[in-house]
Amino acid sequence: MTLVELQSLAKRLGMPGFAAKQIASWLYDKKVASIDEMTNLSLKYRELLKQNYEVGAEAPVDEMRSVDGTVKYLYKVGENHFVESVYIPDDDRATLCVSSQVGCKMNCKFCMTGKQGYKANLTASQIINQIHSLPERDKLTNVVMMGMGEPLDNLDEVLQALEIMTADYGYAWSPKRITLFTVGLRKGLKRFIEESDCHLAISLHSPLAVQRSELMPAEKGYSITEMVELLKNYDFSKQRRLSFEYIVFKGLNDSQVYAKELLKLLRGLDCRINLIRFHDIPGVDLEGADMDTMTRFRDYLTTHGLFTTIRSSRGEDIFAACGMLSTAKQEENNKS
């Protein structure tokens, strides 16, 4: 719950106004598991809370561990649905990849979540629970909203979750610790930029509209050229980072022709490109470019003034890498 929601709750139960901040502190700072632990609230108010609410933290129901240290957690949400989140430890940081929906409507050709189809939006509480219930939460340094689902398609709940992560009453994290990944939706992109200070990453994957629409049907609703024109109205030259994600497919978008088109498309934007290796998924006739090709592509862009990195791949052996999250099997098993 946000502070405004907690204030409304306190008022409804006849609690003093300051109780909302006390409850928030217990939930997000002290991370209690039960209302009984909120000892600076009177017994009367704790009983009132218990009659109407519960902390609601749900532990993961399953986990898978990669040889590279990545951990994929499975959460049950509601009666019949599941989502996955991915914990990625590194030498100097630990990142959690968080989901915003059960499945996804975007149906990107290269993504298993999209193949699963859309099932439900997560509430802000269900998004926050992936952090709150993370066994390694005390080691966490960064959050990326790039798990299952399209965050801008569930923007009200996502913005509430981001508020809890960044507000003084919540986790009090710097927005610079959080990145939202999106295909770019007309109805939500501008609002996110203006209502949040978190980093932004756009799924690009092709600078050409026709090809991008074949890979990502969302291009038909809001073209990448329109998106770039919108982004030029905002300042990304300081601490807030704008990046474009680009899966490099063998023989499809990996030539110098595409590198030149990227330079043309993104000219005038303060941004970076993250190149991503494609991870094979069942039933998809795409193949990833080899590392030599990706390195040449990166070097060409970098020498022409566009800062470009090759993102390391983690958790592929447990289907936790980019584009590989899916709970279709668990959803089907839960029906039977």
Predicted regions, residues:
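Canonical Radical SAM [4Fe-4S] cluster-binding loop centered on the CxxxCxxC motif
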Residues: 89-126
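Conserved AdoMet/S-adenosylmethionine-binding subsite of the radical SAM
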Residues: 135-142, 147-311
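Generic beta-strand structural signal
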Residues: 71, 83, 94-98, 106, ...
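P-loop NTP-binding catalytic core
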Residues: 79-88, 92-93
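Auxiliary Fe-S-binding modules of radical SAM enzymes
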Residues: 1-83, 232-241, 248-336
